[in-house]
Amino acid sequence: MVWILNLIIVLLIAFMSAYLIRHYIFTLTALYYRGGQPRFIPNGSYQPTVSILIPAHNEEKVIGRILQRTIELTYPRKKLEIIVIDDASMDQTGEIAESFARKCERIKVVHRMKGEGGKGKSIVLNEGLKHARGEIVFCFDADYYPQRDIIEKLTAYFVDPKVGAVQGRVTVLNEPNTMVTRLVTLERIGGYRIDQLARDDLRLIPQFGGT
C-alpha cells in the first residue's frame, strides 16, 4: 500500500514539474515573441451573414444588457441575426429575451423545456445551430458586453479561405471590484498574452475558448 502512495506522489511531482517547465518555455517564448507578418490586412469589405448564439440559463440579471448591446452593433442589420437559447431557465431570462424579440425582429428566442435543460453548454449551442442561418456563427455568453464593431472586426479575417475560426480577446468589466475579478483578469492576461502568443510562435495548435 505504501508503494502505491509513493508512486502517486512521484507521478504528481513529475506532472507538476512538466507543467512548470511548459509554462517556463511558454513565458520565455512570449517574452521574445516577434510575430510573423500578417498574410493580409482586413479592410472590412467582406460582410457575410452572421448568426450570434447566446446560450442562457438563469441569466435574468445580464441577458437584457447583452441583447441591448447586440441591437447597437454596427454590422449591417440585414446580415445579422441573434439567437437566444433559453436553457430551461427558472427565472425571468426567457421573458426578458422575448421582450427584446418583440422590439427587434433580428432577435429570436429558442426555449428548451425543463426536462431538456441543464445538460451542458455544447448541447445548448447545438440546439441554437439548428436555427442559425448565417455563414459565420458567433457565440457570446450572456454576461458579455461586446464592442459595437466586434462583428466586422472578426468576420474580416474570413476573407482568407484558410481561416476556419477566429477568437476575440475577453477582458473583465469589473476588474477592480473584488479579489476574484482581479484573479480572473490575471488569468485572462496570462492566457492571451503568454499562452496564445507562445502557441503561435511555436506553431502549436491554437486554443479556442467556448465563447
Question: Over which residues does each language-model region extend?
Answer:
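N-terminal membrane-anchoring/stem segments of glycan-assembly enzymes
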Residues: M1-Y46
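Short, well-formed alpha-helical segments that are part of the catalytic scaffolds
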Residues: F26, Y32, G36-P38, E59-E72
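Catalytic cores of nucleotide-enabled group-transfer and carboxylate-activating enzymes in metabolic
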Residues: Y33, L73-Y75, Q147, A165
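Cell-envelope/extracellular polymer assembly enzymes that use nucleotide-activated donors
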Residues: P48-S51, E81
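Acidic donor-binding segment of Leloir-type glycosyltransferases
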Residues: L67-G115
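Long helical/loop segments within the catalytic core of UDP-sugar-dependent glycosyltransferases
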Residues: A101, E105-K130, G134, R148-D149, ...
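Short aromatic/hydrophobic "clamp" motif used to bind/position activated sugar donors
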Residues: V137
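The conserved acidic donor/metal-binding loop of glycosyltransferases
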Residues: D141-Y145
